[in-house]
Amino acid sequence: MSQDVNKLSKQPTPDKAEDNAFFPSPYSLSQYTAPKTDFDGVEHKGAYKDGKWKVLMIAAEERYVLLENGKMFSTGNHPVEMLLPLHHLMEAGFDVDVATLSGYPAKLELWAMPTEDEAVISTYNKLKEKLKQPKKLADVIKNELGPDSDYLSVFIPGGHAAVVGISESEDVQQTLDWALENDRFIVTLCHGPAALLSAGLNREKSPLEGYSVCVFPDSLDEGANIEIGYLPGRLKWLVADLLTKQSLKVVNDDMTGRTLKDRKLLTGDSPLASNELGKLAVNEMLNAIQNK
C-alpha cells in the first residue's frame, strides 16, 4: 500500500474551470483525506427541545485563493470541518442557518468529502438547499441580530477559502462584535480563525486581544503543504501570524486535533478537531441555556 501511495503524483492537479488554478495533488489527498472520520457518536441527541436557539454559520462563497506566485488554489470550506461539528449541533436539537458575505452559494472542497461517513453525508444532504441558497450576512445583521436574537452561536468552518474576504469583512466584524457584546459563542477551526482578524479591522486593537486560540499551523502552509502539492504555492499571508500580530495567543504549532475554550470562543486546530469541537460546542451551549 505504501509503495502505491508513494507512486502518486505530488504535482497539484489543474482545475480546468479557471486559469492557472489547481486542486491538491493526488499524493496530498492520500495523506489528508479519508472515506470516514473519527465520528464516534452523538452524546446529547435531542437534548435541546425548545426550538428557540440556533446556529449562524458564516460559510465561504469564494472558490479561489490567489497565491504569491500568481497561481490559484481551488478550495472552499472543508466538508469535515463544516459538517461534522454541525452534525453534533443539529442532532442535539439546534437548527442551523447559513450565510455568506454576498448571499452567493457556499463553496465546499468536495475532494475532501468522506464519502463513506454517514454522519457527514447525512448532514450535507440536510443542509444542501441552505448551502446553495444562503442568507446574505448583511441582511442577517440588519434583521436578525440584536440582544434578543435567536442565534446562540456563530460558526465559521475552515478550509483555505476562509482567508478570502471573510478575514477583512465589516459584516463579519459586526457579527463578531454582536456575539461578544451579547455573550454568544464563536466557534471556528483550522483556517476559519482567519475570520477573527476582521474583529480588529480599522481598530487600534482587536476586541479579541488576549484570547487564546487553536489554528492550523503556519509551518504546514509554509512547508509540507507546498512540498506534497496540497498548495500550488505560498499563501500571501498566514493566519496564525496575523492573529498573533493582533495579540491573540495561538497555543499550538502542530496539528493534533486539539480544541480549546477561552470564554465563549471555541476553536480547533484542523479537520482532526472537527468531532471534538462539535461535542465541545454542544456541551457549552447546553450549559449556557441551563444557566440563562
From Swiss-Prot:
Q: Does the keyword Repressor apply?
A: no
Q: Which GO terms describe its molecular function?
A: glyoxalase III activity; protein deglycase activity; thiolester hydrolase activity
Cytoplasm as a keyword? Answer: yes
What reaction(s) does this enzyme catalyze? Answer: N(omega)-(1-hydroxy-2-oxopropyl)-L-arginyl-[protein] + H2O = lactate + L-arginyl-[protein] + H(+); N(6)-(1-hydroxy-2-oxopropyl)-L-lysyl-[protein] + H2O = lactate + L-lysyl-[protein] + H(+); S-(1-hydroxy-2-oxopropyl)-L-cysteinyl-[protein] + H2O = lactate + L-cysteinyl-[protein] + H(+); N(omega)-(1-hydroxy-2-oxoethyl)-L-arginyl-[protein] + H2O = L-arginyl-[protein] + glycolate + H(+)
Q: What are the GO BP annotations of this UniProt entry?
A: DNA repair; methylglyoxal catabolic process to D-lactate via S-lactoyl-glutathione; protein repair
**SUPFAM superfamilies named among the record's database cross-references:** Class I glutamine amidotransferase-like
Q: InterPro entries under this entry?
A: Class_I_gatase-like, DJ-1/PfpI, HchA, Prot/Nucl_acid_deglycase
Enzyme class, UniProt record, top EC level: hydrolase
**What EC numbers are recorded for this enzyme?**
3.1.2.-, 3.5.1.-, 3.5.1.124
- Keywords associated with the record: Cytoplasm, DNA damage, DNA repair, Hydrolase, Stress response
Q: What is its main location?
A: cytoplasm
Q: Locate the region Disordered.
A: 1-23
Task: Show the ranges annotated as biased composition (Polar residues).
Answer: 1-12
Q: Where are the transmembrane segments?
A: none
Give compartment(s): Cytoplasm
The active-site annotation reads 190 (nucleophile)
What's a single GO CC term here? Answer: cytoplasm
Matches recorded under Pfam families: DJ-1_PfpI
* Task performed by this protein: Protein and nucleotide deglycase that catalyzes the deglycation of the Maillard adducts formed between amino groups of proteins or nucleotides and reactive carbonyl groups of glyoxals. Thus, functions as a protein deglycase that repairs methylglyoxal- and glyoxal-glycated proteins, and releases repaired proteins and lactate or glycolate, respectively. Deglycates cysteine, arginine and lysine residues in proteins, and thus reactivates these proteins by reversing glycation by glyoxals.
What family classification does the UniProt entry report for this protein?
Answer: Belongs to the peptidase C56 family. HchA subfamily.
- What is the protein named? Protein/nucleic acid deglycase HchA
